[in-house]
UniProtKB/Swiss-Prot annotation:
Catalytic site positions: 94, 166
InterPro entries tied to this protein: Aldolase_TIM, TIM_sf, TrioseP_Isoase_bac/euk, Triosephosphate_isomerase, Triosephosphate_isomerase_AS
Keywords: Cytoplasm, Gluconeogenesis, Glycolysis, Isomerase
Pathway membership, UniProt: Carbohydrate biosynthesis; gluconeogenesis; Carbohydrate degradation; glycolysis; D-glyceraldehyde 3-phosphate from glycerone phosphate: step 1/1
Family annotation (NCBIfam families): tim
Protein's organism: Clostridium beijerinckii (strain ATCC 51743 / NCIMB 8052) (Clostridium acetobutylicum)
PROSITE patterns reported in the protein's UniProt record: TIM_1, TIM_2
Protein name stated in the entry: Triosephosphate isomerase
Major localization class: cytoplasm
GO biological process, one term: glycolytic process
Pfam families: TIM
Cellular component, GO annotation: cytosol
Matching HAMAP family: TIM_B (MF_00147_B)
EC top class, as a word: isomerase
């Protein structure tokens, strides 16, 4: 049985003080959660948030990282730096990173491998645009991403991997995939992983849904056979809303 994982992607929001206040309010609200609870602050807030959640059941994720260990990469953060801070997860390949920062599948494959090398669990994002959904190429688009992004991993790594399916057209738009659409696509992603690494490993890979997840949508989503959690955007910025999702 796969343990659900619900992660809150704060994107470019919250100062250090606001971030600490947020997790201090969140801690008592999610202390009895049956799923893994993850918050994803900005780089500048990671250390303060990590310290603030110490001793609680809340894990911390970075929103990105570089695949090189060090060097002349101005503005970037190395995986070893995150590992030294005790960061648990890293979100990789979010559609905003792919679109605005031209992240390629080749670079993401390097990042996924490097995260595992540094004992950080990747939350790898994949998804299609509205145009791709409407012209029936959803699975083809996602398969190209998955095949490139998770190539060359060990079965053990694949079993630890978290994948987040986020239809790009449902992010921040208020539109959501129907629960059935989300589940069917996630089932297809699991089949892609199985084709590469066998069904035993694919059955252990946790696959989240991301895309305008709200307190009033989560319960039905989590009742679907293949949805193992959520990557939450806007609703994760409000402690009560995020807690309501975590405690679905």
């Amino acid at each position: 049985m796969r343990k659900a994982i619900i992660a809150g992607n704060w994107k470019m929001n919250k100062t250090i003080d606001e971030a600490v206040k947020m997790v201090e309010e969140l801690k008592p609200l999610v202390k009895d959660a049956t799923c893994d609870v993850v918050v994803c602050p900005t780089f500048v807030c990671l250390d303060a948030v990590k310290k603030a959640v110490a001793g609680s059941n809340i894990k911390v994720a970075a929103q990105n990282m570089h695949f090189e260990e060090s060097g002349a990469f101005t503005g970037e953060v190395a995986p070893g730096m995150l590992e030294a801070m005790g960061i648990d997860y890293v979100v990789l390949g979010h559609s905003e990173r792919r679109e605005y920062f031209n992240e390629t599948d080749e670079a993401l494959n390097k990042k996924v491998k490097k995260a595992f090398e540094h004992n950080i669990t990747p939350i790898l994002c994949c998804g299609e645009s509205l145009e791709q959904r409407e012209n029936g190429t959803t699975n083809k688009v996602i398969e190209a991403q998955i095949k490139a992004d998770i190539a060359g991993l060990t079965n053990e790594q694949v079993e630890k991997l978290v994948i987040a399916y986020e239809p790009i057209w449902a992010i921040g738009t208020g539109k959501t995939a129907t629960d059935e659409q989300a589940n069917e696509t996630i089932k297809a992603i699991r089949a892609m992983v199985a084709e590469m690494y066998g069904s035993e490993s694919a059955e252990k890979t946790r696959i989240q849904y991301g895309g305008s997840v709200k307190p009033n949508t989560i319960k039905a989503q989590m009742e679907m056979s293949d949805i193992d959690g959520a990557l939450v955007g806007g609703a994760s910025l409000v402690p009560a809303d995020f807690a309501a999702i975590v405690n679905y």
